[in-house]
Amino acid sequence: MWNLAGKELSSRLLLGTACYPSLEHMQQAILNSGTEVITISIKRQTSAGLDGESFWQAVKKLDCHFLPNTAGCRNAEAAINTAEIARELFDTHWIKLEVIGDDYNLQPEPFELIKATRILIDRGFEVFPYCTDDLVLCQKLVDAGCKILMPWGAPIGSGKGLINPYALETLRYRFPDITLIIDAGIGKPSHAVQAMEFGFDGVLLNTAVALANHPALMATAFRHAVIAGHQAFTGGMMSERNVAHPSTPLIDTPFWHQVNNL
């Protein structure tokens, strides 16, 4: 069990609800993942014939905590307004704060992100800020009152994994008491394992499952990956060595090498 913003959870995997081939694929993937927290975009647009009302009914049946996000917002004002709508709609003070500053890599706009964070925290929100792995930006968010940081592993939807391991490990070292969740860029279960081995508290992903050939099966794979990575970290992994070291103890010289003095 772990505590996320006052909620006791079993799963350290958070899952998005966008881009699935159908509602049925989405529901089964979420069930297979074992997640207890799903993200939902307030500005979500239905596509591929999916009915909006059917979507809401589907997610309500999943018995998960909702983490609404401000996807699509490009300044603090828009993000704050969206967060207020989300709080009223979902009856939650949780908000995944996204303020995008660039269309090419969907990198967060740091100045607007910090501005929105300060205002939302003052208004009683628990802010889950989508940010980069920049140490100074993360420190500013913590200074603004964030208890949770959600740095990217790579640009949203890229599937490139953890492109700057050093920066992510540095965040874990510098913020030992902050909840750290990798958000964006995860493409394979092995990426999730790596994030958890770094000591991150959780992983949030969407595209890697939604666009898989078999979303439900991929969700199962990520479920086990997150568990394996976390157990590896808590179990205490051996340190790397520059030279070989025998794994079998040599108590004495093998009998066939001993000199027969008889």
Swiss-Prot record:
EC id: 2.8.1.10
One of the protein's GO biological processes: thiamine diphosphate biosynthetic process
Main location: cytoplasm
Location of the active site: 96 (schiff-base intermediate with dxp)
GO molecular function list: thiazole synthase activity
Cell compartment(s), UniProt: Cytoplasm
Reactions catalysed, as given in the entry: [ThiS sulfur-carrier protein]-C-terminal-Gly-aminoethanethioate + 2-iminoacetate + 1-deoxy-D-xylulose 5-phosphate = [ThiS sulfur-carrier protein]-C-terminal Gly-Gly + 2-[(2R,5Z)-2-carboxy-4-methylthiazol-5(2H)-ylidene]ethyl phosphate + 2 H2O + H(+)
Gene3D superfamilies according to UniProt: Aldolase class I
Annotated protein name in UniProt: Thiazole synthase
Species per Swiss-Prot/TrEMBL record: Legionella pneumophila (strain Paris)
Lineage: Bacteria, Pseudomonadati, Pseudomonadota, Gammaproteobacteria, Legionellales
